[in-house]
């Protein structure tokens, strides 16, 4: 019997999912992206070579793994084909092992134009999107007007739908945002070229996944972003436009909940987020700068600096509940090397002194909250590239043990560096 494992981020994204997915694919035959778009970058470092994947599942770097982009992903054909060619330039045979859902909504140039125009228009109130058209594409999907991958292969139908959509979106672009219109003919020509390149790779992904399941193959579902960017459960409105929680596997890949065997939650040993929004444990002092520098905390896609702060157990507890997480993988422990004191947020305190054990549901409700910290001693020894738990400094082990105690869940994996081998596996999710 094969196992079906979900890997997802438990914070605000950028937790190091790509490396862990790549590592786990040594035991998987199939890897699936089930939500998001090319706004999230998964960074892999193998034998000193860094690769950033945005749409293509991280399993593509393993020669015997079949990779799927499922219906929950909003797909930019331009971004996907660019990524394919980049990987092919590095000698990776992508097209024979990549399959794309016919039901993926398309991200087209007008989505990108709308995304950028809105952010500019909002000024200081901007959400801080990546400007890649993700939100507007999901809007079209929910409004039942989206063009999907399958539409590309029906020229007349596609042209008619595109004409109607462009009339609508160009009106908003030109009349409200005072931006140039997107040209119909050039977009139609480009779309037909995309269709020919994508045609050999498309399929009914859900049906394919169930065939793999029936054959007893191991399937790994690769999440993008993190729990607190979820459109429903995140720090709304400072969120992404998709569901990033485990339930998105069910809708975004057509895979029933009873088939999921294990959920691995990825968390940094501290906390980061990109863009605006609440961040209770954010550090604006020299310690925060030190963590950012040591952790090289810059967005893989945008290059934007990440905000850094202490580990927030309040947020993690809720992530565990929302996703029925089986075990944790803690990443970037080595970034904390050399700090005298470490802090873990175990609760929040409001302006009246009331102690809150759960995070609020709306971003504005974080404004008057302060974290309640538990302090632990740091360590001066290096944890970089350690591969055996007993070789970690005693205080590092104590820090991890305390996280387990507070959260009531085991740490099953630990990442001590960017390379595949810089990992401690205490429990293999596929075993």
Curated annotation (Swiss-Prot):
The protein's Enzyme Commission number: 6.3.4.4
GO biological process: 'de novo' AMP biosynthetic process; IMP metabolic process
Gene3D superfamilies according to UniProt: Adenylosuccinate Synthetase, subunit A, domain 1, Adenylosuccinate Synthetase, subunit A, domain 2, Adenylosuccinate Synthetase, subunit A, domain 3
UniProt keyword GTP-binding, yes or no: yes
Annotated GTP binding sites: 13-19, 41-43, 306, 332-334, 415-417
Free-text cofactor note: Binds 1 Mg(2+) ion per subunit.
GO cellular component labels: cytoplasm
Record pathway: Purine metabolism; AMP biosynthesis via de novo pathway; AMP from IMP: step 1/2
Cofactor(s) the protein requires to work: Mg(2+)
PROSITE patterns: ADENYLOSUCCIN_SYN_1, ADENYLOSUCCIN_SYN_2
Subcellular location per the Swiss-Prot or TrEMBL entry: Cytoplasm
Location (main, coarse): cytoplasm
Annotated catalysed reactions: IMP + L-aspartate + GTP = N(6)-(1,2-dicarboxyethyl)-AMP + GDP + phosphate + 2 H(+)
Keyword line: Cytoplasm, GTP-binding, Ligase, Magnesium, Metal-binding, Nucleotide-binding, Purine biosynthesis
Superkingdom in the source lineage: Bacteria
Binding site for Mg(2+): 14, 41
Binding site for IMP: 14-17, 39-42, 130, 144, 225, 240, 304
Family the UniProt entry places it in: Belongs to the adenylosuccinate synthetase family.
PANTHER family named in the record: ADENYLOSUCCINATE SYNTHETASE (PTHR11846:SF0)
Subunit text: Homodimer.
HAMAP family, sorted: Adenylosucc_synth
Name this protein carries in UniProt: Adenylosuccinate synthetase
Organism: Legionella pneumophila (strain Lens)
């Amino acid at each position: 019997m094969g196992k079906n494992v979900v890997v997802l981020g438990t914070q605000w994204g950028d937790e190091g999912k790509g490396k862990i997915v790549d590592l786990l694919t040594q035991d998987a035959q199939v890897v699936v992206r089930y939500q998001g778009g090319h706004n999230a970058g998964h960074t892999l470092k193998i034998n000193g070579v860094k690769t950033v994947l945005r749409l293509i599942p991280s399993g593509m770097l393993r020669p015997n793994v079949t990779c799927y982009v499922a219906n929950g992903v909003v797909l930019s054909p331009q971004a996907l084909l660019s990524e394919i060619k980049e990987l092919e330039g590095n000698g990776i045979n992508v097209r024979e092992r990549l399959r794309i859902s016919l039901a993926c909504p398309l991200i087209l140039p007008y989505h990108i134009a709308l995304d950028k125009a809105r952010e500019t228009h909002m000024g200081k109130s901007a959400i801080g999107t990546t400007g890649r058209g993700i939100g507007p594409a999901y809007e079209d999907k929910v409004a039942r007007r989206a063009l999907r991958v399958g539409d590309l292969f029906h020229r007349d139908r596609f042209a008619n739908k595109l004409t109607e959509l462009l009339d609508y979106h160009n009106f908003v672009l030109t009349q409200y945002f005072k931006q140039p219109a997107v040209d119909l003919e050039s977009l139609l020509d480009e779309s037909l070229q995309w269709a020919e390149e994508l045609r050999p790779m498309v399929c009914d992904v859900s049906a394919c996944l169930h065939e793999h399941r029936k054959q007893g193959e191991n399937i790994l579902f690769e999440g993008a972003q993190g729990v607190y960017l979820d459109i429903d459960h995140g720090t709304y409105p400072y969120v992404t436009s998709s569901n990033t929680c485990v339930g998105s596997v069910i809708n975004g890949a057509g895979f029933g909940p009873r088939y999921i065997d294990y959920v691995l939650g990825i968390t940094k040993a501290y906390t980061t987020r990109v863009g605006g929004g609440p961040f209770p444990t954010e550090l604006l002092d020299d310690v925060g700068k030190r963590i950012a520098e040591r952790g090289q905390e810059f967005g893989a896609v945008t290059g934007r600096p990440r905000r850094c702060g202490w580990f927030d157990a309040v947020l993690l507890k809720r992530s565990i509940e929302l996703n029925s997480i089986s075990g944790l993988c803690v990443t970037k422990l080595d970034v904390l090397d050399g700090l005298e004191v470490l802090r873990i947020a175990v609760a929040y305190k409001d302006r009246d002194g009331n102690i809150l054990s759960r995070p609020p549901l709306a971003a504005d409700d974080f404004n008057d909250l302060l974290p309640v910290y538990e302090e632990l001693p740091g360590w001066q020894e290096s944890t970089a590239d350690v591969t055996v738990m007993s070789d970690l400094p005693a205080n590092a082990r104590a820090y991890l043990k305390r996280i387990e105690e507070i959260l009531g869940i085991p740490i099953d994996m630990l990442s001590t560096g960017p390379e595949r081998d810089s990992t401690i596996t205490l429990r293999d999710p596929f075993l």
